[in-house]
Amino acid sequence: MGQWLPDEFIRRVTKEFPDHAKALIHSLSNETATDRTLRCLQVCSPHEIEGFEPGQRVPWHQEATYFTRGGAEGLRPIHSYPGYQAGAWYVQEAAGLMVHRLLEHLRTEGAPMERLLDACAAPGGKTLALLDFLPKGGILVASEPMEHRLALLDATLARSGSDRVIMVQNQAQNWQGLPGFFDGILVDMPCSGEGMFRKHREAAKDWSMDKSLTLAALQSKIMDSLYQALRPGGWLIYATCTFGKEENTGQLLPWITSGRLEPAALSLPEDWGWVHASVLDQRWNPRHAAWWSIPGLTQGEGFFCSVLRKPIEAKRNDYPPKETLQEPSILREELKKQMRVYKGGLASHPSGYPSPELAMAYGKKHGHYPQTGPWSVEEGCPIVDLDKTLATWFCQGQNLALGELRNGWNLMTYQGLGLGWMHREGTRVQNHFPKSLRIAR
């Protein structure tokens, strides 16, 4: 059992998870990762996906459905479907969707949500969850330290259609320059990735206890920085995709015992299969929000998450609650002092778009840059709604000589959601779907 898993890993989970290790090791060793979910974001058209076989609803997210793909060999990739490109739906691993449930609880409790930070945002699934709870007038900063992963985040946000996100490239341990700025912070910590062994076996080959301890030291630095950036009364969601205590409960307990952070109170139904931290460590109160998703027990990959609050009595910050939200450019300039704002970040005009590189000029008369995504549909703009075949061709970059095209800029839509732009000048037609997002023919 577990022949390809590191021996040291097996010994450790057997010690730390005595009642759950057998199911965990068996699942990691013998089962294929199949717990993908499709989450509806706008109108939902998952049945366009070849071989799509919907399963049950995800218990902790009622807009997400488990699915499989019958005869998956040779089928088109998920991202090649126009519904995905239009932002109608998003595919995400099931356990990570627990973040949505935690955010629901925070909203019910009246937690502040006007200034949010996703500290390790790529590829963007949890950023989308934060956007669901961002109030009108709020701003979300999505930060990613790795250059090649910023492009993934950029594409996800373009498809989402949000105009309230500033993307930045910043190390997660470098937020102390904005003391007490954020109402809420989500950090999906860099970790040893033990929860992904079933999905990525190569991760097990690179695993070692020394690597786990090195990452735990980095996590500690990140927590120091994020704590400074969190306002008194604010909240923090801590997450990893690993099992070891040193990267999870071991990180949080010093903050709790010192009184600098307080765990939120939240319970989950037992039949969801999540394992509470108190089962493994008696220092945790069963009412405190901290759980593991354990393959073999939970219908999801390995994942840990917890919710904590910064006491109101903590030192006040230098940023009055509303001061920096009146104009997005103010926040952008504040961030520029501390880090690189990715591709200009959020434009300074009221309907700013998050990624100027993806924007297409919509005539000199309008003086702004329309974007891909569902919010690019504007009154008075020439619109051509495409069927599945034409939408696929458009996303491949083909120039479609459609009779409905008017001279100038035309917005291509799919099921009413914006895909991108075609430009016609007489008999000449040019496809302006971003090259970085085009799907293979």
Language-model segment annotations:
Residues 111-112, 174-188:
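A short acidic, Gly/Pro-enriched loop at the edge of an enzyme's catalytic core
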Residues 123-136:
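Conserved SAM-binding loop of SAM-dependent methyltransferases across substrates and taxa
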Residues 148, 186-225, 237, 241-248, ...:
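Mobile active-site "lid"/loop adjacent to the S-adenosyl-L-methionine
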